Amino acid sequence: MSETFVLQQITGLLDRGHDVQIFAEKAGLQGHLFAENDQYNLLNRTHYLPPSPLPRWRRWAQTAWLLARLTPTCRSSSLRLAAAYYRNRRCVTPRQFLACIDILAGSFDIVHAHFGPNGLRVLPLMQTDVRSGFVTTFHGYDVTTYVNRYGRAVYEALFTSGDAFTYNSQATAEKLVKLHCPVERMVKVAMGVKLDRQSFRERRLEPGETVNLLSVGRLVEMKGHEYAIRAVSQVKERFSNIRYSIVGSGKEAGNLQALIDELRAGEYIELLGAVSNSQLQDLYRHAHILVHPSVTASNGNMEGQGVVLVEAQAAGLVVLATRHSAFPETVIEGETALLAPERDVNALADNVIRLIEQADRWPAMGRRARRHVEENYDVDKLNDRLVEIYQNVLATKGS
């Protein structure tokens, strides 16, 4: 629920008249999501897993209560569910088994798990005789660090039992194919943006105006903020009228602030921390260039599609990013963005300088970026595609 792109799928399905129930690991609707919650009453649609660890007697009591709610047919399925849980107990906790019983009681047409590990958590349900269709969406870390940690066969049973597997980019698709995901059940559904909520503005640089650079992303190694900070400090030697704002929170905050202090860059580079959605939209409106310097982390973690790149292009920003994961697919190099190799501070700095020196190109780059998003990342079109996938899964299950 903390991922905006998941929320946009949920609200899009509700807008189309479908009933959606949400099963979440823990409470925590972030503040910037409450505006959606007011309209859609999402909290009343959300079921949270019981707190962990529960005493054994509480688990038995809750299991008995959930089983009592089941219809006789579902009770029969629950026996198969228990057997499936036992087979998959290495990747499904007792709490998640209780959630599976709750899902079983709901008699849902479709069970859609976002991120591969969540697909594994409902795997016991897939291995019963329930008629629900099972869809799993892969995003990024689930085909990189998760696989590195648990092995290349971690999704073997999921690939056997699932009905459809969606992915956000060709880069993610290639990783899934290497893991032996059945190609005939793979479908691309990119993560989009609501264009009516992402206001567009052509970017222009007036004489003497400060160049506003913006980064949006968690303060973790994978986001590569260190390299952008070093690059901007180099650019400052050439252009004095520059400011760089970094949105996000994370465990690298202290190290990044120490780097800013070391470079004596505090007057023009600022860590803003986490911001609300309305504050983020305001930052998009006033920025000229989005800097997104992601890298492959030391543990192998990589981004997937790069949703921030989509948001920025929709707003008309010029983009500077790295050749990381699916980024060359999400932007159009040379037309909507400039790309640099990962961890290459000099290349990042050169690209910032190039963009500033070619500021007359910004309006055309912004218009092309908006059109690119309208054609490929309009969440309304993507949600229509998602409904088609659901319908195809159900048609196949019924045949």
Set out the residue ranges of the language-model regions.
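N-terminal subdomain of nucleotide-sugar transferases
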Residues: 1-51, 106-108, 160, 398
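Donor nucleotide-sugar binding/catalytic pocket of nucleotide-sugar-dependent glycosyltransferases
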Residues: 24, 133-139, 151-200, 208
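Conserved donor-binding/catalytic core segment of Leloir-type glycosyltransferases
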Residues: 166, 197, 202-223, 229-232, ...
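Nucleotide-activated donor-binding/catalytic signature segment of Leloir-type glycosyltransferases, i.e.
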Residues: 257-278
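Short alpha-helical donor nucleotide-sugar binding micro-motif in glycosyltransferases
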Residues: 274-275, 282-287
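Acidic donor-binding loop of glycosyltransferase active sites
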Residues: 285-300, 317
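Short hydrophobic beta-strand element within catalytic cores of glycosyltransferases
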Residues: 309, 314, 318-321, 331
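Conserved acidic donor-binding segment of nucleotide-sugar-dependent glycosyltransferases
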Residues: 333-334, 338-345, 354-359
